[in-house]
Amino acid sequence: MSTSIKAIKESLEAVTSLLDPLFQELATDTRSGVQKALKSRQKAIQAELAEEERLEAMLSYEKALYKKGYQAIAGIDEVGRGPLAGPVVAACVILPKYCKIKGLNDSKKIPKSKHETIYQAVKEKALAIGIGIIDNQLIDEVNIYEATKLAMLEAIKQLESQLTQPDYLLIDAMTLDIAISQQSILKGDANSLSIAAASIVAKVTRDQMMANYDRIFPGYGFAKNAGYGTKEHLQGLKAYGITPIHRKSFEPVKSMCCDSTNP
């Protein structure tokens, strides 16, 4: 009596290598259900191997620093440079050595449906997390570039009260005036797991803030557009005017402010 397809599927779930002899054994089973299960498991293993390879590549900066003796590497990234409303948010995250979190990537590449799950995984595994928030008023005062640096420095400062202190900083496309060894990495959130961890923390934190603002200031779509200049947001500006969280140094908000001051 041949093994049931259900039993074969259960056996395949335990297989983790494409070289497992079970694959060769099942290749001669002509049942369509078996062949479908076989191909499905092979595809899943290939995806798992590709993910492992991707994560390993994203640890290259960290591994090089571990070899040099650094122990607590902090990744730093920001979210919210471009929106017309809301703060710029930066995060500083120290992960355990060689830590890999499945699905962790540049937050812009992670499906929104998976943001919260990966965010929670980072929170659970991180040795330390700091968050810096610079509001729209200070952004208008100092410009968004300087505000981004201030947010990053604030995120680092938050680690002072935590057990693990960074001895090296990996920063997404930015150099900070601080007495800690550092490296600026172009597209760092896609090339360093530490920076990617900071990216998702900053992203989820800011999205939560903008969702709260959406309840306070309805009509602009902040929960969906996070303050970016979408059609709904621009229509809201025309219909209701600017809010206390809009950046007055950003167009078209800037022009609206000028128009309102002219007779």
Curated annotation (Swiss-Prot):
Under Enzyme Commission nomenclature, its number is 3.1.26.4
What parts of the sequence cross the membrane? none
The cofactor binding remark recorded in the entry reads: Manganese or magnesium. Binds 1 divalent metal ion per monomer in the absence of substrate. May bind a second metal ion after substrate binding.
**Gene Ontology CC annotation, any one:** ribonuclease H2 complex
The family database entries (Pfam families) matched by this protein are listed as:
RNase_HII
In alphabetical order, the GO MF annotations are: manganese ion binding; RNA binding; RNA-DNA hybrid ribonuclease activity
UniProt main location, coarse: cytoplasm
On whether Metal-binding is a keyword of this UniProt record, the answer is: yes
Annotated localization: Cytoplasm
Q: What does this protein's UniProt record list under function?
A: Endonuclease that specifically degrades the RNA of RNA-DNA hybrids.
Protein name as annotated? Ribonuclease HII
